[in-house]
Amino acid sequence: MSRKALFLLFAALYAAMIFVGCSPTPGPGLARGEQIFDTCFPCHGKDGRGNMSLGAPAIAGLPRWYVERQLHNYKTSMRGAHPQDTEGARMRPMAKSLYRAGDLESVAEYVATLPAGPAFNNMMAMGDTAAGRIAFQSICITCHQEDGTGNEALGAPPLTHQHDWYMMSQLYKFKSGMRGAHPDDAMGAQMAAMSNTLADTTAMHDVIAFIRTLQQ
């Protein structure tokens, strides 16, 4: 993305944040969450489906508990603080702007109402689904479930509506220490350990190829 495009994006985000700050502020809940979401859709889209050019994942279809946890992680710098995590560097100030009591929970509640849509995958030619099935069943299934729908008790989000390019980027971040390395991020540390059992890029492509079959 060009420097001019980035400038325009952040100008739009700043304007949205001012609008939210100057508008009448409802109490915690869906109405407040929808108001706050005005600062989110320039990257994630009004439908929450994400934007590959900005590295913004699909958030529509994510459960409230997972959105809350990730916003908390960004807000407390457990996530997104690594100097090479450019996408995280954009998310941290967004999360830190949720300073009013109930704001974080309200926007998570609103995001959880957005209906999930099909994943926008751009790695269809990559990966061996048979090899990926073996890896998924030995590494991922315990937390993310056989059908990839996730498990709140284990802190595992659903994978069935997430874009393959985003899953690939997060596996790389977990493996490289950009994500899951903070001493207070127990869930992230668990994912980092699981990601490190995937030997190389080929193995990551394989497991993502299998996850794509769960999205059909």
Stretches found by the model and what they are:
Residues 64, 68-76, 104-108, 112, ...:
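An amphipathic alpha-helix signature
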Residues 30, 34-76:
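The feature marks the first
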Residues 52-58, 74-104, 122, 126, ...:
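Axial heme c-ligation environment in periplasmic c-type cytochrome domains
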Residues 19-21:
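C-terminal motif of bacterial Sec signal peptides marking the signal peptidase cleavage site
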Residues 23-26, 49, 58-60, 106-128, ...:
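His/Cys-centered metal/cofactor-coordination and adjacent catalytic loops
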Residues 65-70, 91-134, 139-142, 165-166:
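Intrinsically disordered, glycine/charged-rich N-terminal periplasmic/extracytoplasmic linker segments
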Residues 25-49, 124-149:
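Sequence/structural segment immediately N-terminal to covalent heme-attachment motifs in c-type
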Residues 1-9:
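Bacterial N-terminal signal peptides that target proteins for export
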